[in-house]
Amino acid sequence: MIKLGVNIDHVATLRQARGTTYPDPIEAALIAESAGADAITLHLREDRRHIQDRDVEILRGALKTRMNLESAVTDEMIGFALRIKPHDICLVPERREELTTEGGLDVARHFEQVQRACHRLAEAGIRVSLFVDAEPAQIDASVEAGAPVIEIHTGHYADAQTTDEQQGELERVRAAVSKGLNHGLTVNAGHGLHYLNVQAIAAIPGVSELNIGHAIVARALFVGFERAVREMKNLMLEACK
């Protein structure tokens, strides 16, 4: 059965916009769990623009499901992860000027750095995922680096402007999922997925988990966080029937 990882970053974005203590991403995470989330995803960025260290520290002991911590491949962030010991960590690229993660991690280009991080995290009992574009070379490099999980970047699919372009990107994701599975990897997917485009990705055989945040937080403004999570989970499950 396909799983849903709910990303709570944008609850923290709203909090940080005014420098208040609310809305509380911890509360959002617990509501998401009660609504059917299988994991809670959060990205502790180097610039701390939304999620803060304290959020991660509190959440690590509060979750009943899994914490999936997104992190840049830097000594500071890997060191933090080794101290917190999340269940899962997803290594992602990061640029300070970007609004959101704009593409997959170039594992092939930064192979030694990524491989070293994978080994350090694995030795600490943390399951490592690499957020990569739907490119064969990146999947091959992920296998060589020792990551047991990859998350396919679905942003190009989500941003497609025409039906033909979207279909082409969907086929790229399907091929990447198949290649990952053939290598024995667990394959997740995420980025840019929302209520109108999620089902085609959820229906791909072998996809283990989708990580979705912005769309759920946006929907929650109108229907509440619990319902927003349930609606997304139901769409995913329907697509797999």
UniProtKB/Swiss-Prot annotation:
Pathway: Cofactor biosynthesis; pyridoxine 5'-phosphate biosynthesis; pyridoxine 5'-phosphate from D-erythrose 4-phosphate: step 5/5. InterPro entries: Aldolase_TIM (IPR013785), PyrdxlP_synth_PdxJ (IPR004569), Pyridoxine-5'_phos_synth (IPR036130). The active site is at H43, E70, H191. It is found in: Cytoplasm. CDD domains: PNPsynthase. GO terms for molecular function: pyridoxine 5'-phosphate synthase activity. It catalyses: 3-amino-2-oxopropyl phosphate + 1-deoxy-D-xylulose 5-phosphate = pyridoxine 5'-phosphate + phosphate + 2 H2O + H(+). Disulfide bonds: none annotated. Its EC number is 2.6.99.2. 1-deoxy-D-xylulose 5-phosphate binds at D9, H10, R45, H50, T100. Coiled coil: none annotated. One of its GO terms (biological process) is pyridoxine biosynthetic process. 3-amino-2-oxopropyl phosphate binds at N7, R18, G192, G213, H214. The record marks E151 as: Transition state stabilizer. GO terms for cellular component: cytosol. It is an enzyme of class 2 (transferase). Keywords: Cytoplasm, Pyridoxine biosynthesis, Transferase. Homooctamer; tetramer of dimers. Catalyzes the complicated ring closure reaction between the two acyclic compounds 1-deoxy-D-xylulose-5-phosphate (DXP) and 3-amino-2-oxopropyl phosphate (1-amino-acetone-3-phosphate or AAP) to form pyridoxine 5'-phosphate (PNP) and inorganic phosphate. PANTHER family: PYRIDOXINE 5'-PHOSPHATE SYNTHASE. Belongs to the PNP synthase family. This is Pyridoxine 5'-phosphate synthase. It comes from Nitrosospira multiformis (strain ATCC 25196 / NCIMB 11849 / C 71).
